[in-house]
């Protein structure tokens, strides 16, 4: 346990919302979890599906919620800055994984960011996804806070970012592939949290 006023090496090489080296400006909360089921750990899939991840115990979520509430209030941390290791280092980290209940933290404890379902549905109904360029989609990811390259292709690093976003906001559909639902969620988040 590192005192809150001291630096720890929990994030490693990382970035979010234009900041890098987040060890200097963040507080990490480590949650003990096996993450991926033992019988699925040898899968060669870089993007494990939702059912490969293990559930968290309710007491873990209750305790982590208490810690986050305390730290966020003490340091006035905006909802959008409550993120996962996978959000800040998508090519290296997958924790806390697909079964970490971000939506529950938002709804039950008022922690973190979450999208409005009505906005998501509205963006899904617009049917503009297929006409949206890769560079425009990547710009939406950057707008939310993710560091992503400016290539006009879905290379491995870009898919890592999409997978990290999906782990956080669309975990049952976490594949690393950008799709209509994931894009609609991203647009809904950028509408709700414009800065």
Predicted regions and their residues:
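Active-site-adjacent loop/helix surface patches within enzyme catalytic domains
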Residues: 1-80
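Sec/Tat-exported extracytoplasmic proteins
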Residues: 2, 20, 33-35, 68-75, ...
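Short acidic, glycine/serine/threonine-rich helix-capping segments at coil-helix boundaries
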Residues: 125-195
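Acidic/histidine-rich, metal-coordinating catalytic segments
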Residues: 77-92
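Short, well-ordered, mixed-charge alpha-helical segments that flank or form enzyme active sites
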Residues: 36-38, 90-93
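Acidic, His- and aromatic-enriched active-site or binding-groove loops in soluble protein domains
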Residues: 98-124
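Second-shell loop/turn segments in exported
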Residues: 15-16, 47-59, 91-92, 123-130, ...
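A charge-rich, low-complexity, intrinsically flexible signal that marks solvent-exposed coils, linkers
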Residues: 21, 93-102
